[in-house]
Amino acid sequence: MGMDVYGLNPQTTTERPKRPNNKDYQSEEWDRYFEKLNEYQNENVGTYFRNNVWWWRPLWDYVYQLNDDILTEEDHELGHSNSGHEITEAQCEVICKRLTEALDNGETEEYKKGYYLALENLPLVKCDTCEGVGERNDQYVQ
């Protein structure tokens, strides 16, 4: 599972590709469409961002930490779900500015180090699924 973030009013320089009409999702037509869609998204920053749920949650927590004066607790809570919650263009502009500053001044790197340190220091818990080895090897993954 992952989180998908779409820009509501992104500045684009190219036209978004049209979806094929056929239902054969394994066809070369669909393959070409997805290639073109990836190109479009890479060329038009702000149209789409995706992250798996394990990386999205800490990222969104960090965004909230930097922006808790412009984001509500409801924004924070709903930002952890795939509910389609929207924030304003003004909020997005402030978030972008602050994230860029935090990346440039090293604050994000420090946050990352602290996050990984916290993960390393989590207590071990008994796991009946993997029997404590950290890898699942049952009928669901074989």
Predicted feature residues:
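Acidic (Asp/Glu-rich) sequence patches and key acidic residues
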Residues: 1-142
